[in-house]
UniProtKB/Swiss-Prot annotation:
Record's keyword terms, sorted: Cytoplasm, Fatty acid biosynthesis, Fatty acid metabolism, Lipid biosynthesis, Lipid metabolism, Phosphopantetheine, Phosphoprotein
Source organism of the structure: Moritella marina (Vibrio marinus)
Pathway of action: Lipid metabolism; fatty acid biosynthesis
Free-text description of this protein's post-translational modifications in UniProt: 4'-phosphopantetheine is transferred from CoA to a specific serine of apo-ACP by AcpS. This modification is essential for activity because fatty acids are bound in thioester linkage to the sulfhydryl of the prosthetic group.
Main location: cytoplasm
Domain Carrier, chain residue ranges per copy: 2-77
Family (UniProt): Belongs to the acyl carrier protein (ACP) family.
Lineage: Bacteria, Pseudomonadati, Pseudomonadota, Gammaproteobacteria, Alteromonadales
Protein name: Acyl carrier protein
Record PROSITE patterns: CARRIER, PHOSPHOPANTETHEINE
An example Gene Ontology biological process: lipid A biosynthetic process
Keyword field contains Lipid metabolism: yes
Domain of life where this protein originates: Bacteria
Any one GO molecular function term: acyl binding
One GO location term (cellular component): membrane
């Protein structure tokens, strides 16, 4: 597991209050992890803070799964 992946998953666990074993890469924030729209906004804000980046709204809307969050963070770091 990459450092980025570990950090993203840690944020998801903290923000959504879910168990580590529930945070699978294919998990949907809403359908699998029980997030609502406010949770997803707060999650994006936490990712922005952790990785010192700005995620535009049109990109944030596409971040709906754990893997999408990891992919975005990795691509923005390159």
């Amino acid at each position: 597991m990459s450092n980025f992946e570990e950090r993203v998953k840690k944020i998801i666990i903290e923000q959504l209050g879910v168990k580590e074993e529930e945070v699978k890469n294919e998990a949907s924030f809403v359908d699998d992890l029980g997030a609502d729209s406010l949770d997803t906004v707060e999650l994006v804000m936490a990712l922005e803070e952790e990785f010192d980046t700005d995620i535009p709204d049109d990109e944030a809307e596409k971040i709906t799964t754990v893997q999408a969050a990891i992919d975005y963070v990795v691509s923005s770091a390159e």
